[in-house]
Each structure stands twice: as structure tokens, then as C-alpha cells.
Amino acid sequence: MSRTVFCEYLKQEAEGLDFQLYPGELGKRIFDNISKRAWGEWMKKQTMLVNEKKLNMMNADHRKLLEQEMVNFLFEGKDVHIEGYIPQATN
């Protein structure tokens, strides 16, 4: 049986993550308050960020930037800005 959470990103009840995917207190906050769907949306944005900004996960500054973007996206409602990227219009 899956667990449900009130997803802070979606602002509604949704299926929660199966396990904590990120370490520490932030990981617990994500596990308790972010849905699978929202995490999937973040993973798409994260991939774009890493590729477009050529982030190196061995670099502590790059990891810190990515973590801040994750918090902004999941908890503060701020979209990820990637220069030159124009999202497709939805009808």
C-alpha cells in the first residue's frame, strides 16, 4: 500500500515517495512533504540544470547550487531558469 503526503509542490494530497532519496534533514523534509510526481518533475529540471550549466557533482559549489535550486523549486514555487530554454506552450 502506498503512502500519501500533502505535497507542498502540488498543494494537494498525492502518492508519497517510497523511501528517503536525499540525505539529512532536507531529505526528511522532502520525504515527508513531496510526492512522487513532484520529485519526477524536479528530476527533469535537475537533469536540464546539470547538462545546460555543465555542473560537476564533484564540485561542492555546484552541489550547493543544485540543492538551492531544488529547495526553490520544490518548496518555494520558483521555477528553474535555464538560459535559452523556452518551455512548450500548453493548450
Swiss-Prot record:
Pull one GO CC term from this UniProt entry. Answer: cytosol
Q: What SUPFAM superfamilies does this protein's entry cite?
A: YggX-like
Keywords on this record?
A: Iron
List GO BP terms, alphabetically.
cellular response to oxidative stress
Gene3D superfamilies, alphabetized: Fe(II) trafficking protein YggX
Determine if Iron is one of this entry's keywords. Answer: yes
- Identify a single GO molecular function assigned to this protein: iron ion binding
Q: Which domain of life is it from?
A: Bacteria
- Function as written in the Swiss-Prot or TrEMBL entry: Could be a mediator in iron transactions between iron acquisition and iron-requiring processes, such as synthesis and/or repair of Fe-S clusters in biosynthetic enzymes.
* NCBIfam families per the UniProt record, alphabetical: PRK05408.1
Protein family according to the UniProt entry? Belongs to the Fe(2+)-trafficking protein family.
Q: What is this protein called?
A: Probable Fe(2+)-trafficking protein
What organism, scientifically named, is this protein from?
Mannheimia succiniciproducens (strain KCTC 0769BP / MBEL55E)
Q: What is the lineage of its organism?
A: Bacteria, Pseudomonadati, Pseudomonadota, Gammaproteobacteria, Pasteurellales
